[in-house]
């Protein structure tokens, strides 16, 4: 382990806290107001960064399975009314669509950062899709 520099400190003797004098009147202090404690608040952005790290570490699906399955069936119903799906097929569709969306949001975030912003906007997503040659 690397050696670190130690700074000189003034040596201070430990002192016990003084007891209050008994001659003071005990009733002069204001009574405590309700005892309501404020809830702890993190600095803005701390929880967002924690959430980002949590989801980047995990490999779980981000969208719930049943709502995604209903969406797939609704879209398929518009194309052909008598389509049936294996559960593995819907799982593969969900994996692929989530990977696509995550990558799109990463590119969108890069576009926002390039514009010296931290908030993504629709025009960032349009630029990301245009650079990918996906659409207008």
Curated annotation (Swiss-Prot):
The modification N6-acetyllysine is found at residues 5, 10, 19, 24, 28, 37, 57. It comes from Homo sapiens. Residues 1-43 are annotated as: Disordered. PANTHER family: HISTONE H3. GO terms for cellular component: nucleoplasm; nucleosome; nucleus. The modification N6-glutaryllysine is found at residues 19, 24, 28, 57. Changing residue 47 to V: Triggers interaction with DAXX. The modification N6-succinyllysine is found at residue 57. The modification N6-(beta-hydroxybutyryl)lysine is found at residues 5, 10, 19, 24, 28, 57. The modification N6-methyllysine is found at residues 5, 10, 19, 24, 28, 37-38, 57, 65. This is Histone H3.Y. Pfam families: Histone.
